[in-house]
Regions:
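N-terminal "assembly arms/tails" that initiate or stabilize quaternary assembly
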Residues: 1-75
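Internal mixed-charge
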Residues: 176-178, 185, 192-247
Length: 247
């Protein structure tokens, strides 16, 4: 036999394998929320919740008119603070790595913050449970073995609730979770024909008066009670993702 000596050669390309992230356009629904960036240095922002309207009298013959106070209310909103844990980058890494380690770390911090802020935002918008002015509507479609699928009848029920509350037709936003998007794609030809993600603002389509978006970071609800899981709670088999609508 023959004995040969050789040198194993390796090369570092600088190419990076990154984790999948939510595409920026998939967060287009966040751009539809009015920003109050000028107040973010405060712990709490106070809004005024306008009370009822005055009574309107038609062909009134009784004088003097009744005096009715219109009472407004303070609506405080506490702000969340988001931080990322520090990540060390050594001099050896800066000089030895075949890629820009500092830029990579900064990008991961920005992406992680963006993901968490979006998830917290949609969780905060979603109602805790069904109540007057904040309806929670259960889906009524066929069972897939774990939950009832979403149908156009459920979307119409949501529209009826918004109509009853007097929500203006313009700027009604519906953020569908991927489960509900797939339900509608599977059963509703009209939705399938209109399903087309706008690469600029992330909107899928406009149907039944809603600008519809798709986002998979929506909160979970307990199916039997219709109550939202607390932020950070681990969902069980009896829980399901929800879609969230707002104005």
């Amino acid at each position: 036999g023959a004995l040969r000596a050789g040198v194993l050669r390796e090369i570092w390309t600088g190419e990076m394998i990154k984790a999948f992230r939510t595409a920026p356009e998939a967060l287009g629904w966040m751009d539809r929320i009015r920003a109050y960036n000028q107040y973010v240095e405060n712990d709490v922002i106070h809004f005024t919740e306008i009370g009822g309207d005055p009574a309107v009298l038609v062909n009134n013959t009784t004088y003097p008119l009744n005096i009715t106070a219109l009472t407004d209310a303070d609506k405080p909103i506490s702000l969340d603070k988001f931080d990322t844990e520090a990540t060390p980058v050594t001099d050896d890494e800066l000089h030895a790595c075949s890629y820009d380690k500092m830029a990579s770390v900064q990008e991961r911090h920005r992406d992680a913050l963006r993901e968490k802020i979006a998830q917290k935002a949609i969780h905060g918008i979603a109602p805790d449970e069904n109540a007057t002015g904040i309806p929670v509507i259960k889906t009524t479609g066929a069972s897939d073995g774990t939950r009832l699928k979403m149908t156009f009848a459920d979307l119409l029920a949501l529209k009826r609730e918004f109509d009853k509350m007097g929500v203006p037709m313009q700027d009604r936003i519906l953020v569908l979770c991927s489960d509900h998007v797939n339900d509608l794609l599977e059963t509703e030809q009209k939705f399938k024909e209109h399903y087309n993600i706008n690469q600029t603002d992330g909107k899928i389509c406009r149907m039944y008066g809603f600008d519809i978006y798709e986002y998979d970071g929506t909160p979970y609800y307990t199916m039997s009670t219709g109550k939202k899981l607390a932020w950070g709670a681990v969902p069980a088999s009896t829980d399901a993702k929800a879609s969230v609508a707002f104005y």
